[in-house]
């Protein structure tokens, strides 16, 4: 029996009445290399005095280098991109992206989704969303969600890098996402949010 995989997830979004989008990225690595990937993430953070590696705090050269190094690691990245995302609708968009993400990850052998922790009530919303999404899975499916602060789990940083690269691509900076092309599956979904 195969060991269920863990996906590490983070998000990025752009609110806009017409062109808004929500990116939910999940990074999945073979369990045997989790420690290796953690070390890579710590190395990418370098000597910067930050608690975690974060796409938006890197310059373009660092972003491209990070994407290149992440692409060299065995694993895959599932991304759901929801549109539209008008102002104050990002939580609804997140739920739509997360629902689809659960189904896709389960089909790839993932049984545990570890997401970056947010406020307690927002974490509860994620748990409720996953509980609802499980109805689309086989009755015997074992799929659970947990939350952790990114400062405690560098594997979440990999998902931040993927989400950032996809967001940047949508905003016209194509190189980082192109480097991840061979290990990334991106699915576009309608958030059902309509326009503001």
Regions found by a protein language model. Give the residues of each.
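Phosphate-ester processing/binding pockets and catalytic centers
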Residues: 1-196
């Amino acid at each position: 029996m195969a060991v269920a995989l863990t996906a590490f997830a983070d998000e990025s979004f752009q609110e806009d009445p017409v062109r808004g989008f929500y990116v939910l990225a999940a990074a999945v690595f073979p369990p045997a290399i989790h420690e290796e990937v953690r070390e890579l993430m710590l190395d990418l953070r370098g000597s910067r005095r930050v608690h975690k590696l974060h796409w938006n705090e890197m310059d373009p050269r660092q972003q491209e280098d990070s994407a290149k190094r992440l692409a060299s690691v065995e694993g895959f990245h599932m991304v759901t991109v929801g549109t539209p995302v008008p102002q104050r609708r990002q939580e609804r968009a997140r739920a739509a992206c997360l629902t689809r993400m659960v189904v896709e990850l389960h089909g790839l052998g993932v049984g545990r989704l570890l997401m970056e922790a947010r406020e307690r009530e927002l974490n509860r919303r994620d748990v409720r969303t996953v509980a609802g999404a499980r109805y689309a899975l086989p009755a015997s499916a074992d799929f659970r969600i947990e939350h952790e602060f990114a400062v405690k789990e560098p594997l979440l940083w990999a998902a931040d890098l993927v989400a950032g690269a996809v967001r940047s691509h949508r905003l016209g900076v194509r190189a980082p996402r192109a480097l991840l092309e061979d290990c990334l599956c991106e699915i576009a979904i309608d958030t059902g949010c309509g326009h503001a």
